[in-house]
Design a protein with these regions (language model features):
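Conserved non-cysteine loop/helix-boundary elements of the Radical SAM core domain that shape
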Residues: 1-82, 86-124, 128
Length: 128
């Protein structure tokens, strides 16, 4: 990313915003500082679901509480937040998915600036 930043700094047409994607459990104050130093204005994180049982069933390796913590850190740093949600995950159902999507905008610990929805399709031979 450092090389891309250096190219942008001397480019005729400059990037005015940088959006980075990561996992909620990888967000730290140090990581946010590095992102801001690169000119990051928005971070996209893959929450996927708000139900910890669904996250565990799908081997996400993170909890919704990790997302709450990450979003607070990023908002405190002035970053715009995009969350990725994934309906149709194994272990969920349509009612749970609707509740998860409602929670994204009703829970004060979430409330992102941007939402991306990626419906899950489990492929043959997947561990899921």
């Amino acid at each position: 990313m450092k090389e891309a930043q250096e190219i942008n700094e001397s480019s005729k047409n400059r990037i005015i915003g940088l959006s980075l994607e990561t996992r909620p459990d990888h967000i730290t104050k140090s990581e946010i500082k590095s992102m801001r130093n690169l000119g990051c204005t928005k971070v996209q994180i893959g929450i996927q679901h708000t139900d910890n049982a669904v996250l565990e069933y799908n081997k996400r390796g993170e909890t919704i509480e990790d997302s709450y913590k990450a979003i607070k850190l990023m908002k405190d740093a002035g970053l715009k937040i995009a969350v990725h949600m994934m309906p149709n995950l194994p272990g969920s159902n349509p009612e749970m998915d609707v509740q998860a999507l409602k929670e994204v905008f009703q829970n004060p610990m979430l409330k992102p600036d941007h939402l991306k929805i990626y419906p899950c399709v489990v492929t043959p031979y997947s561990e899921l």
